Amino acid sequence: WYKSISRSIIIAALQYKKVDIFGFSTGGLLALLSTKKDYQEFVSVVCINAALHLNDLRIKTLLPAISFWNDIVKAFNSEKYTKEYVDNFPENIEVNYNKHYITSIEQLSLLMVKTRKILPKIKKPILIIQGKDDPVVNSSSAHEIFENIESRYKSLKIIEAKSHVIVNNKNTEELFQTILEFINKGEK
């Protein structure tokens, strides 16, 4: 994931004088992590429902147990007993996966840890947007990001929403207006 966004930033930096990085959910974490690359063209970050804390208790409780189980059965060369995924029941079945693969959840957990570590080093202007009643990402994520980044130009916007995918619901006009105002402010 991180290599993909890094390549995209390099390509954008070669094409444009100013690059704003946007990320939604896991992409929000990747956008934050991408600030490690301090390109001159990189002017700001917008993260939407950045997945620093998840509401799904299975991630905190079940994942470590499944990972431990998988390690044990692999140690005995019994890979056929490993659990590769947990079922997911997404709100947007047309765009979300119906399975959470254990390896991808482990990667997301690592990304959360790495992102937390770099928060105090983020100095770029940043807009943090969070859906108030997001069923996937705990709203404490947005507050933790806001409180821990060093940027002097930071803004936190909580949007009334009961869904995770707020980029295509009834509040999109408010969401996009907030983003546009943030970007326009940075261009002055």
Question: Where do the language-model regions lie?
Answer:
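Short beta-strand/loop motif that positions the catalytic acidic residue
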Residues: I122, I128-Q130, D134
